[in-house]
């Protein structure tokens, strides 16, 4: 419901070196054509029931992907190769023992490298904007980002505290355009360090408990973790639900989300 209208996408042809197969068409799954701009001609209001009326004031809503444009201008493979992110990506590979990136057989580690890269920048800017890790709202989004980055760092073999090092890189590479990062450097690093250490205290134990739960599911021929067990991981070991889901999905399991939400609701009612 709300303002809407026809839309148009602008694609950039990156050339045959990025693909020349049947999937390499505008709007396809290939890498050759990259959408860099989206335009919506807002001229109708949808009442939510499929009824459209003309807007009194029509407008054009447009948005360009800045780093997608950088991908095109710098002629690189993805946003993780542009100058604003490459040094952070390379730092993560170095901390992981000098692993290769986009090498034969490196798909799984590439995913973890990209997640750590993306999440490190996101957490740094969120904290700079005054968002603090918590169990509610934006604060919980930040907490989930940090904890997911920790997990993927461990998947890469990075041991010990590493997120403050990544935040330092983000600050150094972005401070010219965002001077507030330098002004809040110590604050950002202290928040990241404290949140990482807090999760570290329960992470390994929680992973062991989850592994035991997986074994029990295998023995029972069950592919779904109960909501109660997922809530235990959240409540006792600090595992966000999406973290647990991601770990289990990698191994072919699912989570009873309705059961998790019911357990969460029950605890909140008891706490009143």
Task: Describe the role of every protein-language-model region.
Residues 1-272:
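A glycine- and charged-residue-rich anion-binding loop/surface
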């Amino acid at each position: 419901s709300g303002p809407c209208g026809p839309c148009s996408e602008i694609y950039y042809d990156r050339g045959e070196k990025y693909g020349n197969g049947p999937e390499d068409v505008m709007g396809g799954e290939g890498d050759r054509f990259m959408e860099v701009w989206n335009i919506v001609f807002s001229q109708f209001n949808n009442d939510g029931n499929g009824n459209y009326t003309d807007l009194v004031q029509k407008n054009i809503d447009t948005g360009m992907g800045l780093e997608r444009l950088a991908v095109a201008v710098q002629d690189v493979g993805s946003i993780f190769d542009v100058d604003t992110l490459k040094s952070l990506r390379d730092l993560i590979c170095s901390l992981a023992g000098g692993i290769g990136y986009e090498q034969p057989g490196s798909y799984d580690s590439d995913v973890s490298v990209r997640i750590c890269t993306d999440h490190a920048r996101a957490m740094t800017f969120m904290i700079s904007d005054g968002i603090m890790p918590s169990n509610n709202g934006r604060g919980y989004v930040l907490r989930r980002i940090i904890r997911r980055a920790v997990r993927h760092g461990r998947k890469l073999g990075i041991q010990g505290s590493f997120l403050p090092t990544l935040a330092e890189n983000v600050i150094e590479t972005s401070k010219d355009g965002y001077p507030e990062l330098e002004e809040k450097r110590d604050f950002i690093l202290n928040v990241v360090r404290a949140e990482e250490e807090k999760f570290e205290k329960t992470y390994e134990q929680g992973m062991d408990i989850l592994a035991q739960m997986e074994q029990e599911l295998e023995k029972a021929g069950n592919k779904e973790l109960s909501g109660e067990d997922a809530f235990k991981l959240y409540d006792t070991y600090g595992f966000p639900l999406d973290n647990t889901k991601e770990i289990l999905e990698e191994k072919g399991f699912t989570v009873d989300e309705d059961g998790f939400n019911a357990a969460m609701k029950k605890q909140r009612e008891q706490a009143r």
